[in-house]
Design a protein with these regions (language model features):
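Single conserved hydrophobic/aromatic residue that forms the stacking wall/gate
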Residues: 1-12, 16
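Short, solvent-exposed helix-loop connector elements
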Residues: 163-167
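Internal glycine-rich alpha/beta core junctions
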Residues: 17-160
Length: 167
């Protein structure tokens, strides 16, 4: 839906038609960049400063499908930037999806009635049977904060071994 244009609002008033694809393209690029950074094999890094076994790390990296072995064994086992990068990309993507979901909810509302959802995507209200709730969009909005929390959690874990990473 690269050419999907929606009516955008400022102060709850319609003002311009624009696309959402640019922010989602950036999100895709963030995930692609993250995958590229993960294309290094940590095998042989051991618990701290490498292994005493005579292994050819370049050979094993290639055999396992990695571009190359990691450059630094301490960095391989103690840094969490790979997880931070992924969680950051997830949080930004969630923010954009939340923004899009919010706009869909508003544009679907009785006040605007500019878009409509398929009935399969709606649920009825427990007290108002005529009311239809766009639950998927609401769930996207509601889950965004969880992504922020996970990013914040990993940012505050100290270097090297810390068992709270399992939470």
């Amino acid at each position: 839906h690269r050419d999907l244009h929606l009516s955008l609002r400022r102060q709850r008033q319609m003002c311009i038609r624009d696309r959402y694809c640019e922010m989602l393209k950036r999100d895709k690029k963030r995930f692609e960049n993250n995958l590229e950074l993960l294309d290094e094999c940590p095998l042989g890094s051991a618990a701290l400063s490498g292994t005493s076994y005579k292994i050819d790390r370049t050979y094993t990296a290639k055999k396992l499908g990695f571009k190359k072995p990691t450059d630094n064994s301490i960095d391989s086992v103690s840094d969490r930037d790979f997880a931070i990068d992924f969680l950051y990309a997830s949080a930004v993507c969630a923010m954009h999806l939340s923004r899009l979901a919010e706009d869909f909810i508003i544009l679907n509302s009785d006040a605007y009635q500019l878009i409509s959802f398929n009935d399969k995507m709606l649920t009825g209200s427990s007290i108002m049977p005529q009311k239809k709730n766009p639950d998927p969009a609401e769930l996207i909005r509601g889950r965004t904060g969880i992504n922020y929390g996970k990013l914040n959690s990993i940012l505050t874990i100290p270097l090297t071994l810390n068992l709270t990473i399992n939470d």
